[in-house]
Every structure is written in C-alpha cells, then in structure tokens.
C-alpha cells in the first residue's frame, strides 16, 4: 500500500524542509507534480493569471496543465527573481550557450536558448558542460538533492513512515 500522510504531517514536513527546497516540495504536493516534472519547470511554464502550471513531456510524454495554489505566488515570484540573477550573470559569460532546447525548436529559434522564459525555475548552482554538444549551460537542480532532503526531513520529524517525493 502507498504511504499516505495526514494533513498535519504534510504541514510539518513542508515547514521543516530546507528553505531553498521548500517551494519544490510545496509544488509537488499542491499541484500533484512528479519529481522530474517539478525539476524541469521553466519560468514560462507558470501562468499567474490563470493560476496554473504547464507540464511538458510528463509521464508517458504527455503535456498537461495543473493548478497552482495562490499561496505559492509570492514564493514563485521570489524564485523567478533568483533565476533572473543567475540569468544576468550567465549572459555576461561569453562561453554561455543558454539552456538546452528541443532540437527542432533550437533550429527554428536559435536565440530562444538565451531567453529568460526557457530557463529552469530551479537551476543548478553552477554552469556545466552539456554532454551532447559540449556547450556551457545551466541545468536544473539535481533531483537527488530534493529526494534526500524529503527523506531526511521525514526522519528528523520521526513520522514513522517511509516518506519519499512520490508520497507528496
């Protein structure tokens, strides 16, 4: 049987999460996102007007629109400002190639890789070489970072249940 958390357990878990990872966990819980779906969110995937998120190539390669809790809007705006600071710094680096885009899109809109909207909402802390083309890019946060934090926080709270990202 799957692990189910009570509302008070979820509240305690989310509040005890490390601050820099809390929004990820809140989005997973509140919008029903899977681990890689939340990791791959881009700035342009957020629709503040309709309070929804766009998930591209989710499980089974499907696209879907999910609800966005209005309580998360201030935190999301802060996160976008955080991404913008990385973006501005990255664009000053002549070797920076932008984010990786789907092949057809990269051919059709070569400048899109350096537009803010295509950048990950939860970026890695450092630039790295793309294994496909060797270009200098900023990838998304490593998923194991969130997985370890969720498990560690659940252990710290002594919930007595095996809690993973999938539980959220």
What positions do the PLM features span?
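Conserved catalytic core of the tyrosine transesterase superfamily
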Residues: 1-168
